């Protein structure tokens, strides 16, 4: 008998992510008095990072659309950044801060008798409970989406009478986007345009930016006596009457307006509505919305830590990606150092990862702001192509601002437009949204193709060539750059399916006359003549003829990336994973090519991929492993990636650094003042910041280890390690909901057509698969062919909308249905080698 969560009578899975995610709560058993250990809560548009200080709480508030535009005439019309104009740029500013102060060290580690801080994923709430020799304190906070209001309730008891203070403030600053190299020494930057006031018992701070007027408002409700006063133009405060017990509820929100007066009115109206609704009703609505969010999909892995990272990724995206603009790829809505935003622009290679997993997880709506950003930028993309590249079509610079304007440097990477176009097309393939195809995907696809057609030149060999481009971020240019060719091979056929006549002929002709892949021999730094000496394949034998891919030609000579010898000047190329671009982002190579010589070549290439410190936080190794079916290497390398890059206890990653300094930089770093060029030292620890790339990449890899549909087939469990249990409810391109469960007793898979149509399903290797067509409780057995060497392939030509196909290795009579299993809340911290989620408990409480 096999126990399965698929209900044969009701044709549904008894799998509930809302019931499972409590096991993945983020739990601190000891207080960590640092913003980098903060708890993020957000309504999708406004985010609040809550962290502990020895005598209270601090909350840093961000909103996705608080734009400070560059002063008119400073930057060029079609460029986002003009060299030499530091701090005169278009960037997002923070909203403000709230501090709650007590007259005692309530969160000092030395005085804790009992302590728990918890980020509850199921209901997206943060809570803190502390018991000390001089009193007790409890806090709960959540951010409700519909109202745009965040709510915090606090109860405290102290041995001595105390008079807590709650302060709302905003202290603007420089953006310091190039913190790692240079700064403009203007300490007064960002302080103008701020005003604080107290009206009708509420606190407000307004801010006039160049381009945005906004207000952050705070109200306190409770029966205690309190006073409200303005401290200065940047801050206003509540002071509670002295007493041994205190209890109050805070409501805060951030609103924009045509001017600061309108913004303040919008703020006050939202606070009044929230106060009338009340905390309990707001929480009930909030918890129900999150329950619905979680139950759109489901994942269970054998590795609990990786599963936790997956659900943390979804939590963060729903908390910060429902506003008008996509969050930044570093700190997103969780920055905590005034207006500091490292790498302030939208860097294409970095931000694309955040959205790649969402459609398969059933949450493609969270990528809409990203697609809007790119669609709205098309006029600027066309201008940049004409002005800088002297070509028709759309050119997306790797670095753009909110208008789509590209930087005035490093304009040789031609791939972003094609990548974005294919991301949009993939979204359409999941949703079937014809309006989106018409207004978003096809215009971007046509513009990207038009640009590439203008770049292609016919060589003496009769083939098309591209000259002088770079792969990904700027490096020394090459000819016939691999990343360009793979994006053309992915984009042109996808677009050609929607074209006719001459337009289609041009696309087909270009693809048919592209050079083949450049293959190169292994060198001494790669292997010892028998085994690899570097990378994840160290100690393994190369496959086939032992060749790998080149990345292009420089001065007529083929170029490879350096692996075992990273200082080798002949082959060095600074940005990783170029040779693996056929796997991702192009998606033109994968398990469909198994058994071919090129599959051996790609395997060799993958085996040379670095690990740990040789592997950046933005590399796509988990996705490559999944797309090559390497379940045997998947989990261990994902964990290795976390050990190298998860820099913070709340799951955010750092830039491959250790200690308190970002990116592994030294404690002090020499900077250049941008105008005087004077050198001076800065404590780099001040510039610690989150990065949000490793989590999304791991989430995409996890999904693709369970389900793939980018090759035109639905491939189930393609990279799950033999003997490991797993289960999922995920979505496939073409409009299918796919469920799968694998245990030691067998495997059950369902494919439900959401809008009608055919599909091909590739199942894990087995000769014992059975198939059943299920329509409204009826069941008809299907013929399933015997499996091949690697997998069993089943074709269903016509499935009606809502129709389900059941595939199982166990006879129906030997399946025993089990119900939804509710997980208990996570009791404590979790560890993955040298990194952890949360912090350990106190003695006697673990």
Model-predicted segments: where are they?
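Active-site core of glycosidic bond-cleaving carbohydrate-active enzymes
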Residues: 347-383, 400-404, 409-434, 439-442, ...
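Solvent-exposed beta-hairpin/edge-strand motifs
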Residues: 178-180, 762-779
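Acidic/polar, glycine-enriched structural segments that form the non-catalytic walls/loops
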Residues: 2-36, 41-344, 363-364, 374-383, ...
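Acidic/histidine-rich catalytic neighborhood
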Residues: 447, 451-498
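Surface-exposed beta-strand/loop patches in extracellular or lumenal glycoproteins
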Residues: 162-171, 752-767
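A conserved hydrophobic secondary-structure block that centers on an alpha-helix together
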Residues: 132-140, 144-149, 421, 426-443, ...
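Catalytic cores of secreted or luminal carbohydrate-active enzymes
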Residues: 88-111, 116, 688-739, 747
């Amino acid at each position: 008998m096999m126990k399965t969560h698929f209900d044969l009578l009701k044709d549904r899975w008894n799998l509930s992510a809302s019931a499972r995610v409590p096991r993945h709560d983020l739990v601190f058993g000891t207080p960590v008095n640092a913003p980098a250990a903060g708890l993020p809560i957000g309504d999708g548009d406004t985010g609040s990072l809550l962290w502990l200080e020895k005598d209270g709480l601090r909350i840093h508030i961000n909103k996705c659309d608080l734009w400070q535009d560059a002063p008119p005439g400073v930057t060029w019309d079609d460029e986002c950044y003009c060299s030499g104009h530091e701090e005169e740029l278009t960037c997002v500013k923070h909203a403000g801060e709230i501090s709650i102060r007590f007259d005692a060290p309530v969160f000092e580690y030395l005085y804790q008798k009992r302590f728990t801080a918890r980020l509850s994923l199921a209901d997206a709430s943060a809570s803190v409970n502390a018991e000390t020799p001089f009193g007790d304190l409890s806090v709960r906070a959540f951010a409700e989406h519909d109202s745009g209001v965040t709510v915090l309730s606090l109860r405290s008891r102290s041995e001595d009478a105390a008079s807590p203070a709650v302060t709302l403030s905003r202290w603007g600053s420089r953006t310091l986007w190039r913190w790692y190299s240079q700064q403009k020494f203007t300490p007064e930057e960002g302080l103008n345009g701020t005003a604080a006031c107290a009206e009708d018992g509420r606190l407000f701070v307004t801010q006039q930016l160049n381009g945005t007027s906004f207000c952050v408002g705070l109200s306190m409700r409770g029966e205690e006596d309190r006073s409200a006063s303005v401290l200065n133009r940047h801050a206003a405060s509540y002071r509670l009457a002295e007493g041994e017990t205190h209890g109050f509820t805070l409501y805060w929100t951030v609103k924009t307006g045509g001017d600061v007066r309108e913004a303040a009115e919008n703020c006050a109206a939202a606070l009044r509505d929230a106060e009338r609704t009340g905390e309990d009703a707001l929480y009930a609505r909030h918890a129900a919305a999150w329950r619905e969010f979680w139950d759109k999909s489901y994942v269970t892995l054998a590795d609990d830590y990786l599963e936790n990272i997956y659900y943390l990724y979804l939590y963060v995206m729903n908390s910060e990606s429902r506003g008008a603009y996509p969050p930044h790829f570093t700190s997103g809505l969780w920055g905590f150092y005034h207006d500091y935003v490292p790498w302030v622009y939208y860097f294409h290679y970095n931000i694309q990862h955040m959205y790649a997993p969402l459609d398969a997880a059933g949450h493609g709506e969270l990528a809409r702001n990203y697609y809007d950003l790119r669609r709205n930028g098309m006029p600027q993309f066309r201008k940049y192509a004409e002005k800088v590249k002297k070509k028709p079509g759309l050119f997306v610079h790797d670095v753009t601002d909110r208008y789509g304007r590209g930087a005035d440097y490093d304009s040789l990477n031609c791939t972003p437009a094609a990548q974005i176009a294919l991301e949009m097309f993939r979204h359409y393939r999941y949703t079937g949204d014809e309006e989106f195809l018409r207004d978003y995907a096809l215009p971007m696809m046509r513009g990207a193709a038009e640009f590439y057609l203008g770049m292609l030149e016919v060589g003496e060999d009769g083939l098309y060539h591209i000259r002088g481009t770079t792969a990904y971020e700027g490096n020394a240019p090459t000819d016939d750059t691999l990343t360009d060719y793979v994006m053309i091979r992915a984009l042109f056929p996808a677009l050609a399916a929607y074209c006719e006549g001459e337009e289609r002929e041009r696309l087909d002709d270009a693809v048919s006359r592209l050079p083949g892949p450049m293959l190169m021999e292994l060198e001494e730094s790669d292997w010892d003549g028998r085994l690899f000496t570097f990378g994840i394949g160290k100690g393994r034998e190369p496959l086939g003829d032992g060749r790998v891919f080149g990345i292009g030609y420089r001065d007529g000579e083929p170029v490879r990336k350096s692996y075992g010898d990273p200082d080798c000047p002949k082959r060095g190329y600074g940005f990783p994973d170029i040779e693996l671009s056929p796997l991702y982002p192009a998606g033109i190579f994968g398990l469909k090519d198994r058994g071919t010589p090129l599959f051996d070549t790609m395997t060799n290439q993958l085996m040379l991929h670095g690990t740990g410190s040789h592997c950046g936080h933005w590399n796509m190794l988990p996705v490559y492993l999944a797309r090559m079916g390497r379940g045997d290497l998947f989990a261990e390398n994902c964990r290795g990636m976390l050990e190298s890059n998860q820099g913070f206890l709340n799951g955010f990653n750092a830039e491959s650094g250790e200690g308190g300094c970002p990116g592994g930089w030294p404690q002090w770093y020499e900077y250049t003042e941008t105008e005087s060029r004077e050198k001076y030292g800065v404590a780099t620890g001040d510039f610690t910041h989150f990065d949000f790339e490793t989590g999304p990449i791991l989430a995409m890899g996890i999904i693709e280890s369970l389900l793939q549909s980018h090759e035109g087939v639905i491939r189930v469990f393609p990279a799950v390690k033999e003997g490991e249990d797993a289960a999922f409810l995920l979505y496939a391109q073409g409009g299918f909901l796919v469920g799968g469960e694998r245990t030691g007793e067998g495997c059950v898979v369902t494919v439900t057509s959401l809008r009608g149509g055919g599909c091909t399903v590739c199942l894990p290797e087995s000769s014992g698969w059975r198939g059943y067509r299920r329509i409204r409780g009826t069941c008809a057995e299907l013929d399933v062919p015997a499996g091949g060497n690697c997998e069993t392939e089943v074709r269903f030509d016509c499935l009606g909308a809502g129709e389900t196909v059941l595939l199982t290795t166990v006879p129906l009579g030997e399946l025993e249905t089990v119900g939804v299993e509710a997980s208990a809340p996570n009791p404590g911290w979790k560890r993955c080698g040298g990194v952890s989620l949360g912090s350990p408990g106190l003695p006697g409480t673990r």
